[in-house]
């Protein structure tokens, strides 16, 4: 059983005797053969072959015994099992270093003969460096004999035949699959053609159907568009009234917000000042707290020292008390001794008569005893004085300790009170900070509301500007209509006087074809021209001024946003400004005002947007006066409660 470990083309350097070096590539194959008959052993087979030369064959069989001798000869450090992998690593390093200019590892094939024919060769793995060429491994390979070459060629032929068989089989499989795929492709192409024809007919029917549905949907969409336009006009009127109300509310809200903003800013400044004061107080209280803590630490240290001194004094007092107890015991013993001596003295006095001989001796002894008693009494007095002094010192120390304890207790109480005050101040400062934050949030919210209201105000102002531009355009259109009418009336100046008077009274010539609705291309909406009579009733001073200054010119639309109260002019003669003709107009056949057909109420009329707040308020104040003053000479009309946007006397469409 053989296991191929390595089989690749390896570049090497070929050196023959008396020949130049040449580079070439040789296929190196390494196999591990394991034999079990008669003894289990493993052999390493190294074979060199050349793909271009089939007779180039060198073999080397290394058994475990051969490897041991090789290991001893060349000083190898690996065992037989690890040797193949190390040899493969060296070959791979030679392959990697081959492309470099100065390769570090080289594979050399050395021959002692002039040609590589039947002579053994040496395969060396050389490591090059600037100092020396080191040979890591040198293997002696023997050329193959005829039998080995024939076996090798037979094996190569067998491998090539097997490869050919496998390739022919794969070719047959591929051709079979190709035929199958071609057949399926033709079937799929036929199905695709059928599907295309079906799809074309289906798409044609669908396009016809969808075109019919699309026309029906277009008609429905046109109907819905008309309905939506009508709804839009109604919503537009409602939105204009709502817009005016919103402007009133926003202006009042703006004034309230400004007042609230002022109050909040004042409160903020007051809060800032209180916060500064509280911070200053807090800093002072913290300094006092630090001082008190330092005093407490110093007092605690003194207390510790006094405690140690007190313990030492107590120890000293205990020692003195023990000494006093010893002395008292001695005094008691001596008192007993004195009592005994007294008893002996009594017995001696009693026995004095009998013992007169020993009287002198007893008197001497008695004198000695009295001297000892005196000395003992003096010592007792001294000991009593020492005890009294120690008791006095102990009382003074205890008094000092009591004083220091009382002082420390008072200091701790003061510290606790100051800490409570500090906590209260901190709570107050936190509450003030939270109040300030809430106020700041409220101020930000109010500022945002103020910005939105200001933005809405600016939008309404922009709308007013657009409406003023529209008014100027209306004036221009009216002037152009008046000029056209003037040119037409110049051609018909020969008509009877009665017809001119009737046309003057009615406001415009009946022959003039005045368009009911003026189309404004800039707005995209057709606006109706309101009645001149209602305009004169609403703004009598404007019409009178225009008639006196420009008697020839036609009716113009003017707006005075700051209107005076027209009660006097309206109550006086409501129809005077309408029916008063000018002398120059009589001569030229011109009329001042519009025809009676334009004074009728239009159901489809749309009021203009964006009237200013002052004009609306004035129109509301003048509503009752205008209703009383607006009367036609032939047919009285009933006015509704609401007025038009640009002509306060015109009726809006309901």
Swiss-Prot record:
UniProt comment concerning the protein's domains: The 35 nM long coiled-coil domain mediates homodimerization while the globular N-terminus links the dimers at an angle of 40 degrees to form the inner ring.
Domain PISA positions: 39-91
Coiled coil residues, start to end: 175-471
Tree of life domain: Eukaryota
Post-translational modification as stated in the protein's UniProt record: Ubiquitinated by the SCF(FBXW5) E3 ubiquitin-protein ligase complex during S phase, leading to its degradation and preventing centriole reduplication. Ubiquitinated by the anaphase promoting complex/cyclosome (APC/C) E3 ubiquitin-protein ligase complex, leading to its degradation and preventing centriole reduplication.
Bias type Low complexity, positions: 634-644
Annotated source species: Mus musculus (Mouse)
InterPro entries in alphabetical order: SAS-6_N, SAS-6_N_sf, SAS6_CC
Residue positions where Phosphoserine is found in the record: 509, 612, 654
PANTHER family: SPINDLE ASSEMBLY ABNORMAL PROTEIN 6 HOMOLOG
Null allele phenotype: Mutant embryos arrest at E9.5; likely due to impaired centriole formation that activates the TP53BP1/USP28/TP53 mitotic surveillance pathway, leading to cell death.
Record-linked Pfam families: SAS-6_N, Sas6_CC
Name of the protein in question: Spindle assembly abnormal protein 6 homolog
GO CC terms: centriole; centrosome; cytoplasm; deuterosome; procentriole replication complex
Chain residue ranges for the region called Disordered: 568-589, 634-654
A biological process term (GO) from this entry: positive regulation of spindle assembly
Localization per Swiss-Prot or TrEMBL: Cytoplasm, Cytoskeleton, Microtubule organizing center, Centrosome; Cytoplasm, Cytoskeleton, Microtubule organizing center, Centrosome, Centriole
